[in-house]
Amino acid sequence: MKLPNVRETIFSLKSYISAIMALYLSYSIGLPRPFWAMTTAYIVAQPWSGAVRSKALYRLVGTFCGSAMTVYMVPRLSNSPVVMTAAMVAWVGACLYLSVLDRTPRSYLFMLAGYTAAMIGFPSVSDPSLVFDTALARVEEISLGIVCATLIHSIVLPRGLAPALTLQLDKAVRDAKLWIHDTLSGQNAEQKDRDRRVLANDITQLRLLSTHVPFDTSNLRWTAGAVRAMQDQISALTPAVSAVEDRMRALQGNDQPLPEPVSQVLADISEWINAGAKATHETAVQLRATVTQLTPDIDSRSSWRDALLASLMARLRELIDTYDACLALRREIRAGLAGAPLRAPRAERAANNNSTLHRDHGMALLSALAAGVAISVVCAFWIGTAWSNGATAAMMAAIFSCFFASQDNPVPGIMQFLVYTVYSIPLSALYLLGIMPAIHSFEMLALACLLYTSPSPRDKRQS
């Protein structure tokens, strides 16, 4: 077990303050279920303030859209359980499909629109005349929790993305440097494959962090364009290095050595890259000129080996330019964090960058179908057995399907959620039967909540 550190303790206390603030305002306004506001404040909490802010607006809009669909759907279909189930499955599935396709904070708009409709719609089918009041109350409670969490995490000791993002940028450049060095020095294929996988993971983590940069509370948000440009340059290193590796393998086939000048320029490039932050643009220009001089002229009489050599030189120029751009952008980001303005040409090029992310329609469709099947099975059991709490089960099926849809294998996450839910039953029983009946003021309620919302020892595997 590992005790929480200072940052984790501060994050936990900020989450507690935002939740208690939402709970107090809910009681003051007279909302019917204040616990929704408190729960929402914890659900939207993120360690970095930029992540909370980036998702807040989309969560609000998604909640409103889901509630509006519920108000439209339930009064018209509540008398036909099968049609009502089919309509809800279609809505949740469509929203989840769009959410999985959209790999930006905007995906939360579609996700919230999906499971908010299920969260409000299923419990309202028994009395559809109250669906508008229920939807309005849920929107107010959830919106209050989102606003309170956003305010507290943005104002009280906000934690910027800059330290985490710059560490990830430096790690990506360092891992790229290692892969390039191993490729140019002719390391074994197993080592190069391992280097490539490490860099691919770095690019993924960098993508997840960089989406929140424009919403950050530090100077990092002014470098959003440079961060996106550097992320694209690091991503471009992957095909560039792979292409160099392929050409070198082809040229060295049948135990043929590389020409001495080519081996020398490969060593020079490797030395320049290993210099790290000390690598200069002037050296890159010299290396590019040397590579250009070594490029053979290709005509109809050229051999296949000459064509391979010319292709290798072209890929080396691309590699030099891309790595040099990474270093230049990293220097600009460092200057931007210190408050210096970014250079206009590079900033404009970054702002005009429109990189397209891969959209996995198969994964999105599979997630939507899984959610539809889960909701349909639960609703069939609910309708067939006239289960009094079937609405809660159908609602939770929709929520779990949406929460874990982005994972390749959501089963471990859902099972872990179930295990910790079972573990929480004794503590919940203690509060429900022993502590809550003795509380007669909001102050005592806040103190009682502090006991189970404060930071606690955690397993190292979860850190």
Spans of features found by a protein language model:
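A transmembrane helix-and-boundary motif of multi-pass membrane transporters/channels
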Residues: M1-F215, W222, E332-A335, G339-L342, ...
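Intracellular, membrane-proximal regulatory regions of polytopic membrane proteins
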Residues: M1-K2, S129-A137, L151-A340
